[in-house]
């Protein structure tokens, strides 16, 4: 596949061309990582359209991070009960199933993972031999980004798999 990339001439020191041609390998598998944010629909749609245009398989993944964090311990109610954990995973699977239905393709594969967001996304991508990871990214204020970090940023720093980031909000 040949991809033309628009660039400013000062971005590429060794070319005066407006477009640079790059050779890429065929993209066969696309992993779309989703959370419960309302912007997940946009991320799923953009990732799916991209995968469809390349004739690639689509995998949707949702990560349930640190189940204890979902507990109501701040209300002194203790950790989650097993039933609640199962319900949380079931709700996550239903979320992915609804997304799959919305995209209208039964061949989309879904998976709910438990653990650290970034680690699970990378592990899943490696297990499935994914060619590109699609994620959303909230555009936070710089201080929030420094303090809170970003899952997409962590994934980007820890993987060599190409990523496609869908901006989901404008900067404040």
Regions found by a protein language model. Give the residues of each.
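Glycine-rich, Arg-bearing micro-motifs that act as flexible, cationic patches
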Residues: 132-154, 172
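General small-molecule cofactor/ligand-binding pocket signal
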Residues: 59-61, 109-113, 164
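Intrinsically disordered or low-complexity boundary/linker segments at protein termini
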Residues: 1-42, 157-172
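Small/aliphatic-rich secondary-structure junction motif
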Residues: 23-78
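Structural beta-alpha unit
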Residues: 3-6, 14-25, 100-133, 170-172
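A short acidic, glycine-rich active-site loop
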Residues: 79-91
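Short, hinge-like loop/turn segments at secondary-structure boundaries
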Residues: 75-79, 127-128, 151-152
């Amino acid at each position: 596949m040949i991809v033309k990339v628009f660039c400013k001439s000062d971005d590429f020191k060794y070319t005066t061309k407006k477009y640079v041609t790059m050779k890429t390998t065929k993209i066969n598998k696309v992993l779309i990582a989703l959370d419960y944010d309302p912007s997940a629909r946009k991320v799923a749609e953009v990732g799916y359209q991209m995968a469809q245009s390349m004739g690639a398989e689509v995998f949707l993944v949702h990560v349930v991070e640190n189940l204890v964090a979902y507990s109501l311990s701040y209300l002194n109610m203790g950790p989650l009960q097993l039933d609640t954990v199962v319900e949380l995973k079931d709700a996550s699977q239903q979320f992915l199933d609804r997304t799959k239905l919305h995209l209208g393709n039964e061949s989309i594969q879904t998976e709910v993972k438990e653990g650290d967001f970034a680690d699970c996304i990378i592990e899943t991508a490696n297990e499935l031999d994914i060619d590109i990871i699609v994620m959303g990214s909230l555009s936070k204020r710089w201080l929030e980004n420094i303090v809170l970090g970003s899952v997409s940023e962590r994934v980007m720093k820890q993987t060599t798999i190409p990523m496609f980031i869908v901006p989901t909000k404008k900067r404040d």
